[in-house]
């Protein structure tokens, strides 16, 4: 959950081309934004990317954006650029994936001080058009979970539809 009295995220991180990206950028203003906290080493994150990449292609014109925050095995931009670019290529990801640092609890706390008790990868934050975090979901129930995955997709789309309608 978010820390008491805080509703938005202030990260400013490099994308894989080295350009700094934040939620204040023109591209994200007035849009619903999904922030996925991920690692290329995390199997459930790969399942989530496999869902989000085609979902984004089909829905981006509706005023919704996705940002991936990649926490990798090393706090090394060149190493992580390679691992995260492989992830982008494998799943055909068209949204920005940013290098957020090393995958450890301190790393996440440093990049996202607004989030209380980060508990695992992937964690997905749903942000409304005003920039407020409205929901945080930890974990991902992938296709192997059958009905749970169908329920997840339904709930995901209902949530995005309601945020877009505001």
Predicted features by range, described:
Residues 22-52, 65-66:
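Short active-site neighborhood of thiol/selenol oxidoreductases, capturing the structured segment around
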Residues 47-92, 102-110:
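Structural microenvironment flanking redox-active thiols in thiol-disulfide oxidoreductases
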Residues 12, 84-123, 129:
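Short, internal strand/loop/helix patches
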Residues 28-33, 61-67, 91-96, 129-132:
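Loop/turn elements at helix/coil->beta-strand transitions in domains of secreted/extracellular proteins
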Residues 120-166:
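Thiol-/selenol-based redox modules, centered on thioredoxin-like
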Residues 1-25:
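N-terminal "domain-start" segment that seeds a small globular fold
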Residues 37-39, 69-72, 100-102, 128, ...:
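Active-site-proximal beta-strand/loop segments in catalytic clefts of secreted hydrolases
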């Amino acid at each position: 959950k978010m820390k008491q009295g805080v509703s938005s995220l202030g990260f400013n991180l490099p994308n894989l081309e080295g350009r700094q990206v934040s939620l204040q950028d023109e591209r994200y203003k007035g849009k619903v934004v999904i922030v996925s906290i991920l690692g290329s080493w995390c199997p459930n994150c790969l399942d989530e990317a496999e869902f989000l990449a085609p979902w984004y292609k089909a829905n981006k014109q509706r005023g919704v954006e996705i940002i991936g925050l990649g926490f990798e095995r090393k706090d090394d931009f060149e190493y992580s650029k390679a691992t995260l670019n492989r992830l982008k290529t494998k799943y055909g990801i068209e949204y920005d994936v940013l290098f957020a640092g090393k995958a450890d609890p301190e790393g996440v706390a440093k990049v996202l001080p607004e989030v209380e008790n980060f508990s695992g990868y992937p964690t997905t934050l749903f942000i409304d058009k005003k920039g407020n975090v409205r929901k945080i979901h930890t974990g991902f129930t992938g296709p192997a979970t059958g009905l749970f995955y169908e329920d997840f997709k339904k709930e995901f789309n209902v949530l995005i539809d309601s945020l877009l309608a505001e």
